[in-house]
Amino acid sequence: LTTVDHKRIAALYLGTSLFWFLAGGLEASIIRAQLAFPNGKVVSAEMFNELFTMHGTTMIFLVVMPLSAAFFNLLIPLQIGARDVAFPRLNAFSYWVYLFGSIFLNVSWFVGSAPDGGWFGYTPLTTLAYSHNLNIDFWVLGLQILGVSSLAAGFNFITTIINMRAPGMYFMRMPIFTWMAFIVQFLIVLAFPVITIALVFLQFDRFFGTNFYEIAQGGDPLLWQHLFWIFGHPEVYILILPAFGLVSEILPTFSRKPLFGYPVMVYSGMLIAFLGFGVWAHHMFAVGMGPIADTVFGVMTMLIAIPTGVKIFNWIFTMWGGVLRFTTAMKFAITLVALFTIGGISGVMHASPPADLQQTDTYFIVAHFHYVLVAGSMMGLFGGVYYYFPKFTGRMLDETLGSWHFWLFFIGVNLTFFPMHFSGLYGMPRRIYRYDVGQGWETFNLLSSIGVIFQILGVAIGFWNFWRSRNVGAIAGNDPWGAPTLEWSIPSPPPDYNFARVPTVTSRYPLWDVKSPALTSEIPHSRLGEERVEVEVGGHHTGKVGHAIGNPPGGPVGASTRVPGSPLTPVPPRRLPTAHELGIPMPNPSIKPLFVALFMTLMFSSLIAIHKDKVQLAVVLVITFAGAMTASLYGWLLTPLEDEH
């Protein structure tokens, strides 16, 4: 409750987002049960609307984004040679806001008012004229709360990456994951204010009688669509770029080759982010914007496929000629490359307005974005879990169980979503809760529903693997994979201070410089000539010879003598010196961020009382919780960050 350690906050993000992944998966399973056969009777039309709305909202805002945030928290300080993030308490605050916001959003299930307007909440369907109850209020307020969390984290990570890189860690030496995370933070801080404006307008229309989206009063429902998709399409890259970064860490390690075209990978990520703000209206070709607007946004949609395609080929060339090791993490990474390509091809089709008009709001679109976000984002994130689990926990995951997880999930994803292309082309609209016999959709829907069973089995095995391996997995050591970046130079799990001495970096692959200099002979280094980085671990020198760092007398705790492909030979663990013993100042734990987040959430949620015709109660509650939040914030600001050493 009081931690401000970025690694523990990463664990909190990971556990919470995986819990909501199960909840979102349950919602999807009920949807597929309803659609498995014609005229399904599993749920009512009203419940179906709530299920698909909350499934989309949960998977995007409560699963993929915070699961990416777990990796941001764990890896960014470790990869840049920092001891923590720039603002540790703000980091804790962003997690607690996410937790309380996600709980608030899902409380709606228990009061019979789950959001039911679709995850992009088109007006006027979400205005009071068509939605009288609290359903949309929970959605509007919940997303505003979650937006505060995302913005706080975004500014924190931008500051961390700019200001806290180790000596010699120039921008063009940062690991690709940190680069993609850096780009994502700019997307967040630029995109989330737009959706906040849209939500505030809708909130004012619903709560205070304004007319931003009310047609009869001169409002414009298309304003919502423009504002939402100016946020919504960059959001796609907020969801996928972290997975791209993880894949760009996994493939070089298990190919035993540096990443092909590192600068191009960086610039393509920047270009994707830049162009991502110029393609939003391809979601709106069906609303009648006119031929000029359709042409402009169609061309922009074609252009954004270029930097994305560059990444695909760079990953392929990274593996080409390498010594490949097909670990579970590698399987997930390769699968992202293959399946995201399918999602990209089905997506660039919609750069053509005539084709888009035929496919809009059909299951073809559902197939497309699930190939991007499940076969793309989730495959990459699962690969990241398998790759970094040893660093999180100090234990190895079971590769046999990992293979079962991968293959069942792989089969399930393709069996679920590939047939949706055809049901969509045969004319099946999305969001219908039942369909008649004889439409030609029966086989495709049954296959999609069977595929969910495979996904459930795969995820269940994966979760069992995660839970079991925390305690009984093989000891990992510092670097079980023979990886090239700084995070693998320190003990697993890392000490609270990360690095006993801040390392000096002379190339993109500091550990390969130490362990396998032949692999980095063509990588640019600093002007220090042939001198290689000497990473300090736990107060001890790592050494420079051999493929993997050895464990000399008095050497680092848990260092591995493993060469890829050979059995792991862990070192018996010994106690690491504490930050106090080493004289390293570290931020103190604090409960204040939790209180600020709690009272802020309660302040937002108090507005619900307005729709119960209890305006005076709402005012009293808002003022009370705002005062409590302000008092907690003063306590936060007046408490010293660190003890004096």
Where are these regions (language model features)?
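Membrane-embedded and interfacial regions of multi-pass energy-transducing membrane proteins
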Residues: 1-550, 554-645
